[in-house]
C-alpha cells in the first residue's frame, strides 16, 4: 500500500512538472527523456517517434489523452530526469490540442 501511495505521489509530481512546461522545446525534451534524442528510441519497449507521420503521432497522443490506448507505467530512460514511474495517458493529459499537434509535427520531421 505504501508503494502505491508513493507511486501516485510521484506521478502527481511528474504531471505537475510537465504541466508547467509551456514552450515546445521543453515538451520535446520531456518526450526525448523516454523516446530518445531526436525521438530515436534505443529501448525495445519504447517506440521511436522520429519520422512517423505527424497525423499518426497526433492521433496517438489523442488516444492517450482520452484513455483509448493502454497506458503502461514506465520510467524516464535518458538524461538526468528522476526515474519515477509515469505513463503516456498522464503525460498526454497535460498537453493542449495545439501542443499535441506541434509535437506530432516536430517528431515527424526528425
Regions found by a protein language model. Give the residues of each.
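Bacterial N-terminal signal peptides that target proteins for export
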Residues: 1-8
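N-terminal signal peptide c-region/cleavage motif recognized by signal peptidases
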Residues: 15-18
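Gly/Gly-Pro-rich "capping" loops immediately C-terminal to redox-active cysteine motifs
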Residues: 39-85, 89-91
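C-terminal capping alpha-helices of c-type cytochrome domains
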Residues: 11, 90-110
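Structural micro-motif
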Residues: 29, 84-85, 100-101
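Sequence context surrounding c-type heme c attachment/ligation sites in exported
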Residues: 21-32, 41-42, 50-59, 97
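The canonical Cys-X-X-Cys-His
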Residues: 31-38, 103
Amino acid at each position: 500500500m505504501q508503494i502505491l501511495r508513493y507511486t501516485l505521489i510521484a506521478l502527481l509530481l511528474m504531471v505537475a512538472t510537465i504541466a508547467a512546461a509551456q514552450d515546445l522545446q521543453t515538451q520535446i525534451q520531456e518526450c526525448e527523456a523516454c523516446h530518445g534524442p531526436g525521438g530515436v528510441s534505443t529501448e525495445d519497449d519504447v517506440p521511436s517517434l522520429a519520422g512517423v507521420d505527424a497525423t499518426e503521432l497526433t492521433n496517438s497522443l489523442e488516444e492517450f489523452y482520452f484513455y483509448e490506448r493502454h497506458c503502461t507505467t514506465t520510467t524516464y530512460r535518458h538524461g538526468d530526469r528522476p526515474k519515477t514511474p509515469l505513463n503516456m495517458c498522464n503525460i498526454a493529459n497535460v498537453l493542449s490540442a495545439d501542443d499535441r499537434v506541434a509535437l506530432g509535427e516536430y517528431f515527424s520531421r526528425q
